[in-house]
Amino acid sequence: MSVPTTSRSLPSLVGVLALALAGPAPARAGGDQEVTVPPRVQAQLLAAVASFQTNINLAPDGAVQILVLIKDHDADSERVAHQLTAALGDMKKIMRRPHREIIEPFAGGAALALTCRERGISVVYVAPGLGGVLPEIAQALRGSAVLTVGGVAAFVSRGVVLGFDLVSGRAEMLFNPTQMRALNAHFPASIFQLMRITE
């Protein structure tokens, strides 16, 4: 189900971002799939930004569900996914709601769309290794109100809504408004003040 939610205040996201900037040195994956912001920090920012979505999907029991897509048999993809879900698991609630994290290999756009629709997936996180299938993921989720998040900064310009980068030792959030509109994910305009816009 999709329900209207009450957005958090912008100062609350500023506070989360300030705390996240105190994180450890970045984790890295090889090549053009580089992860520059540690998954623990990504988890904090993901949870904070998701709480601003005003039409977020929820599971039938009202829980926030985060689907983490990995590339099958890819060690870096699996490592980042497990680090992210471990950090999310340490959070008691997201949006003041219970939450669940699921790790699954990407099995095609049709299967992804069905999974999100049947389970009421709130967020799809795309782990390193899946850069080549980003157009398929974006197309599969058009109009779904699912928030897509990329573990790699370059994923934002290639089809996810939210991503993270490290610039001069500071974490930045990247946001793709064009993709946000394509997915029918609603956010207040004020949130863009804290983002680097990438389209």
PLM-predicted stretches and their roles:
Residues 8-15:
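Sec-dependent signal peptide recognition
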